[in-house]
């Protein structure tokens, strides 16, 4: 399938600039009418929101044509990112100090639909939509975000898929380069008139991305440490213009699969210094095998009285088995005496026998059953229906744009996991026995939720007020069948339940000083529900404030925002990726936490400023974040441990900076982008950073350029990590892990 796809892609490819223009004509009868696909709207203005909002259009995304969403989001102030695998396969994203692990503290959506595998019961984003096929990215923070949930502490991230074009159009692109990278993206579709006032059309889209990886496994130098991804989307759209209402129906089907040879096993400090792209031989079999599908049916009616009814029924399924190194048992006596790879890499000297097995040097042979590799096998299901009614009216001298929404949702995660046992034999893993499937973890976590919101944007003279209220009613359940009842007879079934009712108010305000300057602020409740089976019955709660100012002129735009989030209770969630030494899925109270910060964003066109014959865009984003605990406590959550008042949260950099300058001369263009991330703690603490529990700051430069061969054909080049900076990105869950090295990609795009 891969060779067929690449051959087809090589025939013709659509330029990203044309794609951006196509995107401007989103296939909808509603024109600027409100809808539930977007937060801001492809034609919307983030500045019109009384709060913090950012919109990255298809034109923005085309500059570097990133396949890694973490590189895309470096350009957005207030977004915290912890790199992991170098490709953004399972990104760690937070906002305003929420924590970043598996993006489980923010609300993730695609086309306005919750897209985490199980958004309520298991939100850790082991699936993330592939950004290489997206037409836009929306980020919203602050009080306006109460429209979205269930997580409102930091903000929402909404990825916009390719819309059905208004007219017949096609797009194909191909990239080839270092690490044997092969990436293709193609779509074809459009709308056609089939009767007076009736239109029908659709879209077929395919996306492929693969690379051999930049790490080398000891003894297996030719083995891929990269990935292969395929992603397919189909849409059918039907539009009817009527006397009473203009209506549209859209069916969306999506399927993707991933096979990636990635690991949680990092390196010791000394081995990282010697060769940061080395992988110990015990990780030779680590592999993620995953499939995802999405089905949705949308309906929208724009009535003559300017009222818009939107509805979507949706279902997502995600299955994955991450077969990866779990524990080491030097004497082979049984899993009870085995050590986790996190504890071994944290103290290799004190775990010399286990670390020797991990290294698997030539001439070394372990006992049988010394290496335990786990099938981290999970199936997820999420489904629901959501409605939104929106409209505009004038009343008492003010203009109102009101919205009312309802979502009925259910999701679940089915964990059915087991281990295989191996002997390390001269650097090669030899299987010695298998455990019974389900004998390591055997449970179902589920949630049922009803959410309601109401929001009104009131415009009076130069003032805009946006009060809003969200209500979440959530029932959570964990059904633990136990490790002995692998047939799930229920003989040892333990059921835990929890219910949460939450009112989430928010209020935003904007004052337009004149046509160029506006001031804004807001306050809202930050909320996140507990997990099924949590050790805490408490929700995550905060009171979040923001104040800011914007200035927009003909050729430049600047924005400054200050924020303060006062957590009454911060929750930490145990995942494999935290290396926390706890039961996966359990949650821990962190008590009171204060997060304060500043976000600065600016962009200008130096070409317009100096009346040059070409465009020269300059853009930048700076984030300052300070997050610290306000109480003393001892936690069973590894990244926290023994906490003292004033301890800073892990993996939240104090400073982040992004800057880019480009050129667009019509027939050629390009950009150089630089991002700098401050040093971070890898566990809670204060004072001078300990090199063994921190990651140094780093600067990464990316560059891209394009040349218009014809009006429809572009030749492109993109360089990741131009200076070949060697840097660490994390110490969790098991040892130091590197960022991606320099890679050069060459591309061709054609539109038709």
Ranges and model annotations:
Residues 169-171, 176-210, 215-261, 287-291, ...:
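Transmembrane beta-barrel wall of Gram-negative outer-membrane proteins
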Residues 113-141, 234:
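Short acidic/polar hinge/loop motifs at secondary-structure boundaries
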Residues 298-302, 308-326, 512, 518-522, ...:
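Membrane-embedded beta-barrel scaffold of Gram-negative outer-membrane proteins
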Residues 21-62, 70, 302:
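Short, acidic, small-residue-rich periplasmic hinge/interaction motif at the N-terminus
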């Amino acid at each position: 399938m891969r060779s067929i796809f690449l051959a087809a892609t090589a025939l013709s490819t659509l330029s990203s600039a044309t794609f951006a223009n196509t995107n401007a004509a989103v296939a909808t009868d509603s024109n600027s009418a409100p809808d539930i696909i977007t937060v801001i709207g492809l034609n919307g203005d983030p500045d019109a929101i009384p709060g913090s909002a950012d919109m990255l259009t298809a034109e923005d995304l085309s500059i570097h044509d990133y396949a890694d969403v973490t590189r895309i989001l470096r350009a957005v102030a207030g977004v915290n990112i912890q790199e992991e695998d170098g490709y953004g396969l399972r990104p760690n994203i937070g906002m305003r100090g929420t924590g970043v692990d598996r993006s489980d503290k923010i609300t993730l959506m695609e086309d306005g639909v919750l897209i985490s595998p199980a958004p309520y019961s298991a939100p850790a984003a082991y699936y993330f939509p592939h950004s290489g096929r997206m037409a836009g990215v929306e980020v919203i923070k602050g009080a306006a975000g109460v429209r979205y949930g269930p997580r409102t502490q930091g903000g929402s991230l909404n990825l916009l898929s390719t819309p059905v074009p208004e007219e017949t159009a096609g797009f194909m692109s191909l990239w080839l380069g270092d690490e044997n990278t092969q990436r293709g993206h193609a779509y074809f579709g459009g709308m056609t008139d089939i009767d007076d006032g009736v239109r029908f059309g659709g879209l077929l889209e395919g996306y492929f991305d693969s690379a051999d990886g930049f790490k080398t496994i000891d003894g297996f130098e030719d083995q891929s440490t990269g990935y292969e991804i395929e992603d397919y989307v189909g849409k059918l759209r039907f539009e009817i213009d009527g006397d009473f209402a203009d209506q549209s129906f859209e069916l969306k089907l999506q399927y993707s699969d991933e096979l990636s040879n990635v690991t949680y096993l990092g390196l010791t400090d000394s081995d990282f210094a010697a060769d940061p792209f080395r992988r110990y031989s015990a990780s030779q079999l680590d592999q993620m095998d995953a499939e995802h599908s999405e089905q949705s049916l949308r309906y929208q009616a724009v009535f003559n009285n300017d009222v818009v009814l939107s509805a979507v029924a949706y279902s997502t399924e995600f299955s994955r088995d991450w077969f990866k190194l779990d524990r080491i048992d030097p004497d082979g006596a049984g899993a009870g005496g085995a050590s986790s790879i996190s504890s071994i890499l944290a103290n290799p000297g004190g775990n010399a026998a286990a670390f020797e097995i991990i290294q698997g040097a030539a001439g070394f042979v372990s006992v049988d059953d010394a290496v335990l590799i786990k099938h981290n096998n999970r199936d997820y299901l999420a489904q629901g229906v959501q409605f939104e009614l929106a409209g505009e009216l004038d009343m008492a001298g003010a203009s109102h744009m009101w919205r009312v929404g309802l979502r009925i949702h259910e999701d679940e995660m089915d964990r059915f996991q087991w281990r295989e046992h191996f002997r390390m034999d001269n650097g090669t893993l030899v299987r010695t026995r298998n455990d019974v499937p389900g004998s390591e973890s055997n449970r179902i976590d589920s949630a049922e939720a009803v959410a309601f919101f109401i929001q009104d944007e009131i415009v009076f003279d130069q003032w805009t007020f946006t009060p809003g209220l969200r209500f979440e009613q959530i029932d959570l359940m964990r059904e633990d069948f136990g490790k002995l009842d692998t047939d799930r007879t229920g003989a040892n079934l333990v059921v835990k339940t929890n219910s949460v009712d939450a009112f989430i108010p928010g209020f935003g305000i904007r004052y337009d000083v004149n046509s160029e300057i506006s001031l804004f602020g807001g306050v809202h409740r930050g909320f996140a529900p507990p997990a099924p089976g949590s050790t805490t019955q408490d929700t995550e709660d905060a009171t979040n404030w923001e104040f800011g100012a914007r200035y927009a002129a003909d050729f430049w735009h600047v924005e400054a925002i200050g924020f303060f989030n006062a957590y009454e209770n911060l929750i930490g969630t145990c995942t494999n990726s935290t290396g926390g030494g706890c039961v996966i899925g359990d949650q821990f109270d962190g008590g009171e936490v204060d997060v304060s910060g500043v976000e600065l964003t600016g962009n200008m066109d130096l070409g317009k400023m100096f009346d040059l014959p070409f465009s020269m865009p300059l853009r930048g984003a700076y984030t300052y974040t300070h997050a610290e605990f306000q109480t003393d406590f001892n936690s069973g959550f590894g990244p926290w441990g023994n906490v003292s008042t004033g301890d800073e949260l892990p993996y939240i950099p104090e400073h982040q900076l992004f800057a880019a300058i480009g050129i667009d001369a019509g027939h050629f263009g390009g950009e150089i982008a630089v991002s700098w991330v401050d040093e971070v703690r890898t566990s809670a603490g204060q004072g001078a950073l300990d090199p063994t529990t921190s990651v140094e700051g780093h600067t990464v430069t990316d560059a891209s350029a394009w040349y218009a061969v014809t009006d429809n054909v572009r030749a492109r080049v993109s360089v990741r990590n131009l200076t070949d900076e060697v840097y660490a990105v994390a110490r969790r869950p098991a040892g130091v892990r590197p960022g991606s090295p320099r890679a050069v990609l060459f591309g061709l795009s054609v539109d038709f």
